[in-house]
Amino acid sequence: MKKLLPILIGLSLSGFSSLSQAENLMQVYQQARLSNPELRKSAADRDAAFEKINEARSPLLPQLGLGADYTYSNGYRDANGINSNATSASLQLTQSIFDMSKWRALTLQEKAAGIQDVTYQTDQQTLILNTATAYFNVLNAIDVLSYTQAQKEAIYRQLDQTTQRFNVGLVAITDVQNARAQYDTVLANEVTARNNLDNAVEQLRQITGNYYPELAALNVENFKTDKPQPVNALLKEAEKRNLSLLQARLSQDLAREQIRQAQDGHLPTLDLTASTGISDTSYSGSKTRGAAGTQYDDSNMGQNKVGLSFSLPIYQGGMVNSQVKQAQYNFVGASEQLESAHRSVVQTVRSSFNNINASISSINAYKQAVVSAQSSLDAMEAGYSVGTRTIVDVLDATTTLYNAKQELANARYNYLINQLNIKSALGTLNEQDLLALNNALSKPVSTNPENVAPQTPEQNAIADGYAPDSPAPVVQQTSARTTTSNGHNPFRN
């Protein structure tokens, strides 16, 4: 036990260390693939459908049965004194020679199993897409919260500086009020961003069953975009490989086969039967033997039988014709479903194609928007310092900058998700696509809102020190200096 204790401690520590490491996209997906209940249910349904093929095949194979019987008879009244013991055993063999309905049932089950297999493949692709979407939603929520925190710090600095300028009489109180209003707005946005991050983490947990303290973040420096193939080429590939379209085609084939199965109700059946049996009967009692000799003889018999059983349905009240019509109507419905699936695939491919191109354009546009917004903010701050711009201009420029950064991050994640969407529409989405995205990830980031954007109660309390409804402060000739370093209230005057 003393030797095992260090090993157990080491295993426990290694388990904690593995949990503390950042998980990447592939690791998260592997955990989802192993633990996702919906995918596991789909796999069980597929296995059950294929196992049912053996059940459908069994009526076509020989049916062998063994029977045994024992009967004891005790006579009374006129049969008083006559008792008997009867024992019998038989072996029966039945082989279907011609029964088209049984062959058709086997074919139907094979097609149904094929549909279930396609359903499982669809669920696999859905899990890949949902896992990646939830993963990138978490990263996007982290970015939004980070930018909101940075915007809050920037607005706070502007609020601090504006208050100090107001204290020395350089600006009007409306500038302070505008800065405070903007700061309160950012605080509200921060609450929303924190909540969105918590919800995104919970959505990922719902898929994988695990919480992740850290996730590998997107490598923005090496982020690249690729234009998709021409839409006509994508549509041709989707025609061949889209799983929804394939499932609709298989369902149409199944409905066609069900028409043939209903028509087989008019066909005859022919079965071969063979049996062998023995029986033994013995008598006892006072009346089983008379004066003239034995009246009830014991018997021991055996018998072999071979025969053919033929059946031809002539009229069944119109049931077969009704079943044929029902199957024909079901085939029409399956055909319409195939057309609907085809239109849906075309729409999905074209929409995904357009979304990818739009994401690429948005990324390029927001990159330039960030650069322009930063230049505008620098110009506004310089103009405000010399009195040619107002604090409203500075606040608007700050908001524009951080909104552009958030939109740029959102466009990047939308591009990645749209890449997976179009592969899913083509029916080619697999783990290799996740591996390619996984290579675009880099350093870990925390998923805890407190680590992404620590709460600033002291800063908020300082900001709350100024009440817009309070009387205007007395102007004092004091030097403008930053007071946040020592924790004093810059709005106390």
From Swiss-Prot:
Periplasmic compartment ranges equal: 23-62, 97-268, 312-493
Q: What happens when the gene is disrupted?
A: Cannot grow on efflux substrates novobiocin or fusidic acid.
Q: Where in the cell is it found?
A: Cell outer membrane
Q: Pfam families attached here?
A: OEP
Q: Spell out the SUPFAM superfamilies in the cross-references.
A: Outer membrane efflux proteins (OEP) (SSF56954)
Highest taxon of the lineage: Bacteria
Q: Which residues lie on this side of the membrane: Extracellular?
A: 75-82, 280-300
Region Disordered: start and end of each range? 270-298, 446-493
Name any Gene Ontology BP term: response to antibiotic
Sorted alphabetically, which InterPro entries does this protein's record hold? Answer: Bacterial_OMF, OMP_efflux, T1SS_OMP_TolC
Q: Where is the signal peptide?
A: 1-22
On assembly, the entry states: Homotrimer. Part of tripartite efflux systems, which are composed of an inner membrane transporter, a periplasmic membrane fusion protein, and an outer membrane component, TolC. The complexes form a large protein conduit and can translocate molecules across both the inner and outer membranes. TolC interacts with the membrane fusion proteins AcrA, EmrA and MacA.
Q: What is this protein called?
A: Outer membrane protein TolC
Q: Which organism is it from?
A: Escherichia coli (strain K12)
- Gene that encodes the chain: tolC
